[in-house]
Amino acid sequence: MIINIGLSGATGKMGRTILERIDNFKNCKISAKFNSTRDLHELNDLCKNSDVVIDFSTPEILEKLVDSALKYDTKLVIGTTGFTSSQFKLLEKAAKTLPILYSANMSIGANLLGYLAKEATKILDDYDIEILEAHHRAKKDAPSGTAIMLAEMVTAEKELDITFNRGNKTRRTNEIGISSLRGGNVHGTHEIFFLGDDETITLKHEALNKNSFADGAIRAAIWLQDKQTGLYSMLDFYKNLINYHLKKPI
C-alpha cells in the first residue's frame, strides 16, 4: 500500500529536500503540495488528498492546517518551529483526535544528542549546563527550536530555568542558558556543555546538509500510519532503535 504524503512548505529549503529524497522510499509518494504563497483554503485540498501531511512552513498557517486535518482525518508531521504557547496548545488539543508528531529536529543525530544529554544530566548533577547553537544567517527564530527542545529534554531530568539572555547578570545555579550564533550557510550545529570545576564535557551534533532532517520526516510520516491519537515526538520514533542498540553487549 502506497502512503500519500502531502507536503506543506514545498518550495522552502526543507520542502525541496524532501522532494529530492522521497524516491528513496518505495512505500510512499508526494500526493499534494502547498506553499505559503497560495490561498490557505487550498490546505483543504492538501489534506483531502493525503494520508499524512509533512509541514515545514510558517507558524501563521497552523490553525488552518489543523482545521483541514481534522476535517479530513489527516495525520500530521510538524517540523515548523517558532510556535507560540497558544499554538502548542492547539496542537495538543488536535492530538486528542489525530495522531500528530511534532519535533523541532527530525534527524536521528539531534535526537540521540538529546537522549545522551538526558543521561549525562542524571550523572553530572553538580555541573553547570549550557547550550550553544549556530545556524545560517537567514534563519528567523533564535534560539533555534532544536536548542529549546534539547534544553527541555535536560530540564525534564533536572529542575532548571531556561534563559536566553542574561545581559549583565551573573549565572544562577538553577538555570540552563542558550546562546545563538547566526552567519554563513550553517545547516545547524548544537553543542551541550557540562561545565564542572575541574573538567568540561561537550556533546555536539552538526548537520552537514538537510538530508537527515528530510529522511527523518519521511520516516516519521510512515511510522505514524498505525499510531493511535496522541502527540508524539521524534524520540518516540527513535527510542526503539536506541533501546535496541543499548541492549547490545559492549
UniProtKB/Swiss-Prot annotation:
GO terms for molecular function: 4-hydroxy-tetrahydrodipicolinate reductase; NAD binding; NADP binding; oxidoreductase activity, acting on CH or CH2 groups, NAD or NADP as acceptor. Belongs to the DapB family. One of its GO terms (biological process) is lysine biosynthetic process via diaminopimelate. PROSITE patterns: DAPB (PS01298). NAD(+) binds at G9, A10, T11, G12, K13, M14, G79, T80, T81, S103, A104, N105, M106. Catalyzes the conversion of 4-hydroxy-tetrahydrodipicolinate (HTPA) to tetrahydrodipicolinate. Pathway: Amino-acid biosynthesis; L-lysine biosynthesis via DAP pathway; (S)-tetrahydrodipicolinate from L-aspartate: step 4/4. It holds the Pfam family DapB_N. The gene is dapB. HAMAP family: DapB. (S)-2,3,4,5-tetrahydrodipicolinate binds at H136, G145, T146. It catalyses: (S)-2,3,4,5-tetrahydrodipicolinate + NAD(+) + H2O = (2S,4S)-4-hydroxy-2,3,4,5-tetrahydrodipicolinate + NADH + H(+); (S)-2,3,4,5-tetrahydrodipicolinate + NADP(+) + H2O = (2S,4S)-4-hydroxy-2,3,4,5-tetrahydrodipicolinate + NADPH + H(+). Keywords: Amino-acid biosynthesis, Cytoplasm, Diaminopimelate biosynthesis, Lysine biosynthesis, NAD, NADP, Oxidoreductase. The lineage of its organism: Bacteria, Pseudomonadati, Pseudomonadota, Alphaproteobacteria, Rickettsiales. Its EC number is 1.17.1.8. PANTHER family: 4-HYDROXY-TETRAHYDRODIPICOLINATE REDUCTASE, DIHYDRODIPICOLINATE REDUCTASE. It is found in: Cytoplasm. This is 4-hydroxy-tetrahydrodipicolinate reductase. CDD domains: DHDPR_N (cd02274). The active site is at H135 (proton donor/acceptor), K139 (proton donor). GO terms for cellular component: cytosol.
